[in-house]
């Protein structure tokens, strides 16, 4: 007679085949998200260089003509134009944001399926894209008038006299437009990664 506290378990013979468990889990689908996160990080590094390069180039744009009169000295500097001051400040802010967004981009590489960092980055990328586009467009308009003048308003082109100044400001505008294009790519890639979730 068996007591009520014991359980009878039949002994297995060594000849009975045992089922085998899978030790390695199947890879999660969506490994391409890690690739997008790596490209995102590299593009952010490029955008940092473009934005801070644009701000630095514009901030150092200064030229004084070698001739002057008794009362006037002819000088062109970025701080003579409020649009260029706005440009320097906003592109510096954009560059700082991009530097501060690099850790979140690294988190997206480590955890490619995490939604929080991607959503946060896409929202802030859109805000700073707007800021970068506004400053690049306004500076481009002033650079265009500096190169070509405006006959209707009797504004003369100043780039004939201030060639170095115009070259620096034009380079800064081109660099800022590169940053804008990179922002657009970042937003599209983030949207694709979020849309496939």
Curated annotation (Swiss-Prot):
Extracellular face residues: 56-85, 140-171
InterPro entries: CASP/CASPL, CASP_dom, CASPL
Cytoplasmic side: 1-34, 107-118, 193-197
GO CC annotation: plasma membrane
Compartments reported by the entry: Cell membrane
GO biological process assignments: cell wall organization
The keyword Nucleus belongs to this UniProt entry's keyword annotation: no
Keyword Manganese on entry: no
Transmembrane residue ranges: 35-55, 86-106, 119-139, 172-192
Keywords of this entry: Cell membrane, Cell wall biogenesis/degradation, Membrane, Transmembrane, Transmembrane helix
Membrane topology (UniProt): Multi-pass membrane protein
Coiled coil: none
Subunit structure: Homodimer and heterodimers.
Protein family according to the UniProt entry: Belongs to the Casparian strip membrane proteins (CASP) family.
Its job: Regulates membrane-cell wall junctions and localized cell wall deposition. Required for establishment of the Casparian strip membrane domain (CSD) and the subsequent formation of Casparian strips, a cell wall modification of the root endodermis that determines an apoplastic barrier between the intraorganismal apoplasm and the extraorganismal apoplasm and prevents lateral diffusion.
Protein name: Casparian strip membrane protein 4
Organism: Lotus japonicus
């Amino acid at each position: 007679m068996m007591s009520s506290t014991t359980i009878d378990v039949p002994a297995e013979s060594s000849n009975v085949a045992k089922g085998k468990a899978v030790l390695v889990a199947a890879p999660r689908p969506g490994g391409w998200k890690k690739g997008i996160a790596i490209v995102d990080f590299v593009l952010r590094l490029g955008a940092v260089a473009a934005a801070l390069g644009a701000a630095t180039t514009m901030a150092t744009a200064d030229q004084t003509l070698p001739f002057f009169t008794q009362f006037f000295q002819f000088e062109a500097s970025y701080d003579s134009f409020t649009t260029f001051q706005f440009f320097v400040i906003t592109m510096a802010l954009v560059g700082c944001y991009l530097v501060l967004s690099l850790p979140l981009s690294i988190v997206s590489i480590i955890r490619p399926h995490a939604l929080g960092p991607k959503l946060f980055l896409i929202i802030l990328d859109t805000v700073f894209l707007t800021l970068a586009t506004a400053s690049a467009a306004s500076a481009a308009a002033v650079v265009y008038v500096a190169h070509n003048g405006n006959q209707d308003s009797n504004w003369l082109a100043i780039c004939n006299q201030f060639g170095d100044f115009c070259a620096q400001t034009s380079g800064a505008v081109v660099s800022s437009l590169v940053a804008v294009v990179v922002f657009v790519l970042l937003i599209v890639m983030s949207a694709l990664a979020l849309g496939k979730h």
